């Protein structure tokens, strides 16, 4: 209900997530129906004039994004649009950093086992991913890593603590790591690093922080030699 109410009040951000249930509606929907009635309430004692109540449902695309957002572990934030509804349209910094780290780990394991061919395969995959992350997820002007919306072909502008994942994974260049450190002030608060710089009212946005992400940031800073920043 809270999600539907938000989209009713912020129609510009609805992106077809709310569908009016008219005869012949063909757009895929799911979940329970919601009623909306708009009333003109006069300032006098006269009775309110109300439009006919309309039935709406949230679209199937909204629920696909919602389930993807919950699988991401970052539920709920506005990082991937309102209530994470567009999660399935993004290439996230955190997921790609984790995949890079996995590929590098598999390369090392293959070497330990004496599987040179297998090690080379994982090495090439990791390097290809590193280049794509640098190309699509790095914002040179802001000096931070951002998620990429592959549906709109646009880099997000939502500053999120996942920007520290490339440092933790060791895929950031020295210059990129220095730029992220220079922008620590964007995130830093008396209690540590919040999840984002946007106060949306959701669980994983400002002012809330998450211990796991604090450790990712600290380990990432140490990996690139920024021990003083990690210590504070």
Indicate residue ranges for each PLM-predicted region.
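Structural helix-adjacent loops and short alpha-helical linkers that scaffold large soluble proteins
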Residues: 1-4, 14-15, 110-127, 170-182, ...
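Amphipathic, soluble alpha/beta structural segments
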Residues: 86, 199-230
């Amino acid at each position: 209900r809270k999600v539907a109410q938000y989209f009713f009040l912020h129609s510009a951000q609805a992106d077809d997530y709310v569908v009016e249930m008219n005869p012949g509606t063909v757009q895929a929907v799911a979940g329970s129906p919601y009623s909306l009635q708009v009333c003109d309430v006069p300032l006098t004692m006269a009775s309110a004039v109300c439009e006919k109540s309309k039935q709406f449902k949230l679209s199937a695309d909204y629920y696909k994004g919602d389930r993807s957002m919950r699988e991401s572990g970052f539920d709920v934030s506005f990082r991937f649009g309102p209530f994470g509804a567009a999660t399935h349209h993004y290439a996230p910094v955190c997921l790609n950093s984790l995949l890079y780290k996995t590929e590098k780990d598999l390369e090392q394991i293959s070497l330990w086992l004496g599987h040179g061919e297998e090690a080379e395969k994982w090495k090439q995959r990791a390097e290809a991913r590193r280049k794509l992350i640098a190309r699509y997820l790095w914002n040179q002007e802001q000096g931070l890593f951002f998620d990429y919306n592959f549906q709109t072909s646009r880099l997000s502008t939502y500053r999120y603590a996942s920007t520290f994942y490339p440092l933790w994974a060791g895929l950031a260049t020295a210059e990129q790591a220095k730029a992220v450190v220079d922008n620590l002030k964007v995130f830093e608060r008396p209690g540590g690093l919040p999840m984002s710089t946007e106060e949306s009212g959701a669980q994983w946005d400002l002012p809330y922080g998450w211990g796991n992400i604090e450790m990712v940031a600290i380990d990432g800073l140490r990996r690139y030699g920024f021990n003083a920043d990690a210590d504070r």
